[in-house]
Amino acid sequence: MLQTTVISSILVFSLVILLLVVLLGIAEKKLLPQGDVEILINDDKEKSPNVKPGSSLLSALASQSIFIPSACGGGGTCSQCKCQVLEGGGEILPTEVSHFSRSEIQDNYRLACQVKVKNDMSVKIPDEIFSIQKWDCTVRSNHNVATFIKELVLELPKGEILDFKSGGYIQIDVPKYEFKYSEFDIEKEYHEDWDNYKMWDLLAKNDNPEEYRAYSMANHPAEGNIVMLNVRIAHPPPQQWDAPPGIASSYIFNLKPGDKVTISGPYGEFFIKDTEREMVYIG
């Protein structure tokens, strides 16, 4: 009797899941247009791609090599993916309101990561966005410079230059992965601290193939053929050691010389102003 009840419960549960999947498929076909939609950019047809509906505006443009800054990886928290959605974006979402002033909302400013592409759209983005590029770089070195900090040096493809200003940053793509911290190459002088904190026991995992994070360059702009990043490992806090460690920092700590890494950039707007006024630098 008990066995029959268990089997019946499993069958009912499976049928409910199957029904929901079918309903979602039908709803998607009904609510989303079939075929591509156009994103008109800055009223310029030549810059305006046709994309598949269903993704965020941020992801849709990135698929066409138009990279709007998003330091939080599309989480809706950094507000750096601001743009004007003039048509086709619908009403502003509650998750966006706190990032804009009343006048900005009236001027149709939105967060590209929160706007879903459902139909033809008209948007306005800064022209400098089109100078942002994407490269497949090679890891030159990845050494510890402190107990929990690594200095990652990436080489751009031959002949390519990252033309950035001090204060700029890049975004690094994080692929799907799963590995243990015991696989990291950590200099022996830091092993004792890693032993004490039981860092080797941690497990890192990323299931999202479209994950990315922003990191500021640590090298001089004149060294445009490399990208140097100083990255601190984001391990769980001591009182919540069962929490997952940082997705991007764990990925970076596991990189070895010769590995391929995809980056985009340069991004940034926090630069030294050309002024005669006195400036105070805090490090």
Regions found by a protein language model. Name each.
Residues 1-13:
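Feature marks short, highly hydrophobic, charge-poor N-terminal signal-anchor/signal peptide-like helices
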Residues 21-42:
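Transmembrane-cytosolic junction motif
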Residues 138-257:
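Ferredoxin-reductase
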Residues 58-69, 79-130:
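Iron-sulfur (Fe-S) cluster-binding segments and ferredoxin-like electron-carrier domains
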Residues 243-283:
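FNR/FR-type flavoprotein reductase catalytic core
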Residues 56, 80, 169, 257-260:
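Residue-level marker of beta-strand positions
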Residues 36-55:
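Membrane-cytosol interface motif
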